[in-house]
């Protein structure tokens, strides 16, 4: 009883201060201290030993140790109560959080100050540089004007970059549109070519080239008359020269054989003479008269070019190219009598020559009406 009262009397005044000091000096590692013991040990010793002197010595030693702990505090010393540990733990966490917050504030403030100082130093350097440059040129400017001009240049540069980017985007859109139009045009061209090819497949060769037959006929006539080989430019020139006095196209009554023979046989000779009329001098050429001509020399190469080979009263000597160059005209054999001429014959048939053709099983006598 006395020991308990003495302990409370000795430790009552410093109880609050001791608790606060333990809370404030608690270390991060929170393990229990190595103190001598507590009130449960005293009760156990006094009950089991029942020794008065031993109990007094233990109480005295306990009080001395507790007093020494209060005078000489240790890093790990506390009374072992859970309340003190929890309060110390909370305070330590708060203190660490506070230290962390304070450090962050300090670093933030230091960065701000450093940024301001650097900006001020740069401003001073710019001012010094501008003043020196303007002093040479006889001008004085402040750093604010220089910074304003720099900001204006930056804005202009940004505006130019924006315009360039917009132009690039517009150009990309235009190129895409042009590419789309080109694809549409190419598709249309392909469809047109397919349609033309389909149409050409249905057209006959003669319908594709309307002058093909006429050009070929003119080329054959040119080759037969001049003896020259076939060339395209001669064909075109012959066609151009013969288009003026082109003979009328054959009627439907003529057969295929008539058309094939009409290419080789000229239409200058009539198979029978016409009776004389009042206008013979105007219509009848004086080449084919019924009176025989006096004999002349043999025809030469110049005679073929100058004198037309029409209505000769004597047969020509046979040659290898009679079928190509010499038409079978004006033979001496007389023709059988035919029907009397009519008024239409004078309009359609020129009274040029009286000719006779030898009878051949593969040929026919042709009269050009």
From Swiss-Prot:
Location of region: Disordered = 151-170
Q: Which one Pfam family would you cite for this protein? A: NPIP
In the record, the note on similarity to other proteins reads: Belongs to the NPIP family.
- This one is known as Nuclear pore complex-interacting protein family member A9
Organism source for this protein?
Homo sapiens
């Amino acid at each position: 009883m006395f020991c308990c009262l003495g302990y409370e009397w000795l430790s009552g005044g410093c109880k609050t201060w001791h608790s606060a000091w333990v809370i404030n000096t608690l270390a991060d590692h929170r393990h229990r201290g190595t103190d001598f013991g507590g009130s449960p040990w005293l009760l156990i010793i006094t009950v089991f030993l029942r020794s008065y002197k031993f109990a007094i010595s233990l109480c005295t030693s306990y009080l001395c140790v507790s007093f020494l702990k209060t005078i000489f505090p240790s890093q790990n010393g506390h009374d072992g109560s859970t309340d003190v540990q929890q309060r110390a733990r909370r305070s330590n966490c708060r203190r660490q959080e506070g230290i962390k917050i304070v450090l962050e504030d300090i670093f933030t403030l230091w960065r701000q100050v450093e940024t301001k100082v650097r900006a001020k130093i740069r401003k001073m350097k710019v001012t010094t540089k501008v003043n020196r440059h303007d002093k040479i040129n006889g001008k004085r400017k402040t750093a604010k004007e220089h910074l304003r001009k720099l900001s204006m240049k930056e804005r202009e540069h940004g505006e130019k970059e924006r315009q360039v980017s917009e132009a690039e985007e517009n150009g990309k859109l235009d190129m895409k549109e042009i590419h789309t139009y080109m694809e549409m045009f190419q598709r249309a061209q392909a469809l047109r070519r397919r349609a033309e090819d389909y149409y050409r497949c249905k057209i006959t060769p003669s319908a594709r080239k309307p002058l093909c037959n006429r050009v070929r006929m003119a080329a054959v006539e040119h080759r037969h008359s001049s003896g020259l080989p076939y060339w395209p430019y001669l064909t075109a020139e012959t066609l151009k020269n013969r288009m003026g006095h082109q003979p009328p196209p054959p009627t439907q009554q003529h057969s295929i054989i008539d058309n094939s023979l009409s290419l080789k046989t000229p239409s200058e000779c009539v198979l029978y003479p016409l009776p004389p009329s009042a206008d013979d001098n105007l219509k009848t050429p004086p080449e084919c008269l019924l009176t025989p001509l006096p004999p002349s020399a043999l025809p030469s190469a110049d005679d073929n070019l100058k004198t037309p080979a029409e209505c000769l009263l004597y047969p020509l000597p046979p040659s290898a190219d009679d079928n190509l160059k010499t038409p079978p005209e004006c033979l001496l054999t007389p023709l059988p009598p035919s029907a009397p001429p009519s008024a239409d014959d004078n309009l359609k048939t020129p009274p040029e020559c009286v000719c006779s053709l030898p009878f051949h099983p593969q040929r026919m006598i042709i009269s050009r009406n």
